[in-house]
Amino acid sequence: MYRRIRDLREDADLTQTQVAGYLGMSKTGYSKYETGENDIPTQVLIALAKFYHTSVDYLLGLTDER
């Protein structure tokens, strides 16, 4: 899951700061999601899925269909 959110961000040519801003959080906090240091709350997963126009199932690795 953590690799997928990083890959989606990089594919969109976005910085961690930009995604963190969308989520209303600090870059440091968001970075900890990408590295797996912190678990990603459900509401953040939903927001990321909407942001990247994908499903929560894709982010969680339950499907490979974006």
Residue ranges and their predicted role:
Residues R3-Y22:
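Short basic helix-loop element that most often maps to the first helix and adjoining turn
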Residues T17, T28, D57:
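Key DNA-contact positions within bacterial/archaeal DNA-binding proteins
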Residues K32, L60-R66:
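Short, charged recognition helix plus adjacent turn
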